[in-house]
């Protein structure tokens, strides 16, 4: 199980590449039928006329601390996926933005994430799903994605291991990418490295040096880590 705590195999040129990606998608604002009412969502569909190798859901950080689907880290993750020609669905958890309901401490939010998968899957029949999430959203997304057979790959961004039980991952054999700031306030580097090293299956951890939980000033490296991992797994992907 490879554990990369740096950009092993990537040139310095790639690390410094300007990731100002152009937008090549149709954007749809919609509401999903959630368990406690409607869930506000945005679906980006690539304008390329080809079947994508993946379709993705990206979950946002903790809503009680200002997290929404418009969070900068979530937006950058979605933008990176979009640049690769991957359809992306972002949504607001219950009680966030225009979504109905109240925050449920990560329990009901798992049902919300499942609704997002249920909506996305029939939009792209037969296409495997990728579940990604940032911070609180990474825990929700990983929990749901590990259980759901439609999800074949997982991405955890800013994994908050300091205060969260992540033992559920010990039973998850699906390929996983973790992108983490070396100075993350909510996930000590050493602990994240230990957690990922002990996981079954194919896992990669990319530590972004000098970055905090929100990857301030380091979003180019953040974007490059996601793009590189997906291109390795899916050589047919190419950045627009």
Regions found by a protein language model. Give the residues of each.
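Alpha/beta-hydrolase fold nucleophile elbow
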Residues: 124-134
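Short beta-strand/loop motif that positions the catalytic acidic residue
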Residues: 172, 178-180, 184
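Short, surface-exposed "cap/lid" segments of acyl-processing enzymes
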Residues: 48-90
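N-terminal cap/lid segment of alpha/beta-hydrolase-fold proteins
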Residues: 19-51
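Gly/Ala-rich beta-loop-alpha elbow adjacent to hydrolase catalytic centers
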Residues: 133-141
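Alpha/beta-hydrolase active-site loop
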Residues: 103-123
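Acidic catalytic loop of the alpha/beta-hydrolase fold
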Residues: 182-187, 214
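Catalytic histidine neighborhood in serine/cysteine hydrolases
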Residues: 198-214
